[in-house]
């Protein structure tokens, strides 16, 4: 393989060397041969300039030839053409503008210069003069067999074609009685204006060949020329002008009558415009009256609108007040329903104490309650019905509870009595201050136990909304206790309260032993506690005063996501 690669490299090197040698030999041969030398650039540029100069000279020669040709055409077009017509002649003479290389138009249009140029180029001008004369006679001449009256035939007297492109076409006619006046007027007008371009005469014939040509058929003059001056005039014999003065006067008279008719028409128009102005004024007055009436109607319509607007505002205010009153009434009804439900739950617990309070209230005006202290001293306190009412229990409700208790006759147990004392401490100011210093978990446990002890297990309680996290935390603590009995909840509540606040019994009252009549006071305290709890839970307040609020006034535990409120059932 290595040998093969070496051979390939050797071949490539030899090819490269051969190519370079060939290039060197070719360059040497070119340098030695003068014919193969590079061309001189200066010579090439000089040749190109010579070619450009030659082309410019040719263009100038062409322009000079074109200008000379146009000058010859102008000289040819300056010839005079004499046209004569009989009085009863009919037909139409039109001299149209000459255009470069424009063909001759058929029928009544003939461009003599174009025909002359074509004939001159072909070298047949002298041979076909008769044809040109015949063409002129066809356009201008009169054909007697087409007329209904005797008229002298039109004779083309002089048709001369000059080699210098000047033409004179003379047509002599003897009967110019009816046509001389318009021609004379036209001739005088052309002389006064001095217009370089004079239009040819156009005569309109009448259908009635026997009648004379109307004076109003004044010849129309039209000339169109682009860059060429064409002058054509009418040479009329002087001996016929005297006899033809009368038709000119007739024409003037006709024109004066038309002017008078036009003036009369304009005066009639001015007379007719007067009632239009009057009508405009009347219409403007009517519009002003209509506008005034509409303004009065609008003013009358807008005046009473203000009073209904005030009335509507008042009705809206009344509706708002009524809606707010309805909301307050609904809120009060909900509170009353919650209170009634709580009362039904605590009827069994309050009946015994309520009956005793009622009996004592009927028999004696004062209730003696003996409290034993640690030292053995006894204190006597008198609680009247007025003091019970001031504590938050209305007299009517107390009497109703007493009646239920008297009818049932159920006595309270020792646990219920002790729980009543604990609940009374929790609802006091000192108890609320002490509970607020506890941990949020302990507060939630106390809330759940208190709820089970008073309302029972959480069976069908509605879960609070997500927007109230404190209520949801209390409800969760209540539901976590499950189907716990109220007595068990009371006992656990007192034990947890003793662990959290060891001296709560001594701080609340001077002793923990109650008199027999002390059961009545405990029942009243439980009733007040139940009413206060249900009122606050129904309103949804999270930080109001009461038993639940006193238990949880500190900030919730952020780790467990709980707060310090349990919703009412």
Curated annotation (Swiss-Prot):
Reading the lineage from the top rank, the first entry is Eukaryota
What's the main place this protein lives?
endoplasmic reticulum
User: What name does the UniProt record give this protein?
Assistant: Acyl-CoA-binding domain-containing protein 5
Which residue positions carry a glycan here? 508
Ranges where the ACB domain occurs? 415-506
The record's subcellular location field reads: Endoplasmic reticulum
What tissues contain this protein?
Highly expressed in seeds and leaves. Expressed at low levels in roots.
Extent of Polar residues compositional bias = 533-544, 552-569
Q: Which residues bind an acyl-CoA?
A: 474, 493
Phylogenetic lineage: Eukaryota, Viridiplantae, Streptophyta, Embryophyta, Tracheophyta
Q: What induces it?
A: Induced by salt stress and infection with the rice blast fungus Magnaporthe oryzae. Down-regulated by cold stress and wounding.
Q: Which UniProt keywords apply?
A: Endoplasmic reticulum, Glycoprotein, Lipid-binding, Signal
Asked if the Swiss-Prot or TrEMBL record annotates the protein with the keyword Glycoprotein, the reply is yes
- State the family named in the UniProt similarity comment for this chain: Belongs to the ACBP family.
One term under GO cellular component: endoplasmic reticulum
- GO terms of molecular function: fatty-acyl-CoA binding
């Amino acid at each position: 393989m290595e040998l093969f690669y070496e051979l390939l490299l050797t071949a490539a090197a030899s090819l490269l060397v051969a190519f370079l040698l060939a290039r060197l030999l070719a360059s040497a041969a070119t340098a030695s041969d003068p014919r193969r030398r590079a061309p001189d650039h200066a010579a090439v540029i000089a040749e190109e300039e010579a070619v450009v100069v030659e082309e410019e000279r040719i263009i100038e020669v062409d322009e000079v030839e074109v200008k000379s040709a146009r000058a010859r055409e102008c000289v040819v077009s300056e010839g005079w053409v004499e046209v004569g017509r009989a009085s009863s002649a009919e037909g139409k003479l039109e001299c149209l503008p000459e255009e470069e290389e424009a063909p001759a138009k058929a029928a009544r249009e003939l461009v003599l210069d174009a025909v002359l140029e074509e004939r001159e180029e072909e070298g047949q001008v002298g041979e076909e003069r008769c044809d040109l004369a015949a063409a002129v006679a066809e356009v201008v001449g009169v054909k007697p067999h087409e007329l209904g009256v005797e008229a002298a035939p039109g004779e083309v007297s002089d048709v001369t074609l000059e080699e210098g492109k000047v033409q004179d076409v003379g047509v002599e006619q003897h009967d110019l009685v009816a046509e001389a006046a318009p021609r004379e007027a036209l001739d005088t007008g052309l002389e006064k204006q001095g217009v370089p371009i004079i239009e040819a005469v156009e005569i309109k014939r009448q259908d009635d060949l026997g009648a004379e040509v109307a004076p109003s058929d004044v010849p129309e003059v039209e000339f169109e020329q682009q860059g060429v001056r064409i002058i054509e005039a009418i040479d009329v014999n002087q001996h016929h002008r005297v006899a033809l003065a009368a038709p000119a006067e007739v024409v003037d008279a006709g024109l004066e009558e038309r002017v008078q008719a036009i003036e009369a028409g304009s005066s009639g128009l001015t007379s007719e415009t007067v009632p239009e102005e009057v009508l405009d004024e009347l219409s403007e007055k009517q519009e002003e009256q209509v506008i005034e009436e509409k303004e009065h109607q609008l003013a009358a319509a807008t005046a009473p609108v203000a009073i209904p607007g005030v009335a509507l505002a008042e009705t809206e205010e009344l509706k708002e007040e009524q809606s707010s009153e309805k909301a307050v009434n609904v809120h009060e009804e909900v509170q009353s329903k919650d209170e009634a439900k709580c009362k039904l739950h605590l009827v069994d617990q309050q009946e015994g104490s309520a009956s005793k309070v009622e009996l004592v209230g009927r028999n004696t005006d004062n209730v003696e309650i003996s409290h034993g202290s640690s030292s053995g001293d006894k204190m006597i306190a008198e609680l009247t019905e007025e003091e019970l009412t001031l504590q938050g229990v209305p007299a009517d409700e107390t009497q109703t509870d007493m009646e239920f208790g008297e009818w049932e006759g159920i006595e309270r147990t020792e646990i219920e009595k002790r729980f009543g004392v604990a609940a009374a401490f929790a609802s006091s100011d000192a108890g609320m201050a002490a509970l607020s210093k506890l941990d949020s978990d302990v507060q939630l446990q106390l809330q759940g136990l208190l709820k089970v002890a008073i309302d029972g297990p959480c069976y069908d309680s509605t879960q609070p909304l997500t927007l109230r996290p404190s209520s949801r935390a209390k409800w969760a603590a209540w539901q976590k206790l499950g189907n716990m009995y109220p007595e068990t909840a009371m006992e656990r509540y007192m034990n947890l309260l003793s662990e959290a606040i060891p001296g709560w019994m001594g701080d609340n009252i001077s002793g923990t032993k109650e008199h027999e009549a002390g059961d009545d006071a405990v029942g009243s305290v439980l009733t007040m506690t139940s009413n206060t709890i249900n009122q606050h839970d129904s309103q949804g307040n999270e930080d109001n005063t009461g038993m639940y609020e006193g238990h949880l006034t500190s900030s919730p535990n952020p780790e467990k996501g709980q707060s310090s409120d349990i919703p009412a059932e």
